[in-house]
Amino acid sequence: MQMVTPPFKGENKGHYTAGVISNGMLYVSGQLSIDPDTREVCPGDIREHTRLALNNVDRVLKHAGVQRDQVVMCRVYTPDVKYWGPINEVYADFFGDHKPARVIVSTTTLHFGCLVEIEAVAELTSD
């Protein structure tokens, strides 16, 4: 097992690692819409929150040497299912022709008032 910890400003207060490689798979912990360099919550709309959370997922992928087209599954958490449309638009732009399995889960609130949290699972090698 290998821990994947991309650099970011400040200290992570949660008891978890950004990513874990195990048995040929990368498991990316939930990435909030928080800027990793400033540690500030995204001030924008749902599209900007989604873009930032996906960029944070991408940051973990890249740190592990994994490409977006190796992602096999994402879970997207949001406080309201009404955001499904704009989340889907940004998600489609991010992944392009690649369509990993996905679920969008409507929750109550997310930590720090974020509008999106995304976790992912990726293969270390593509077929």
Residue ranges, per PLM feature:
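N-terminal presequence-like segments and the immediate start of the first folded domain
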Residues: 1-55, 59-72, 78-127
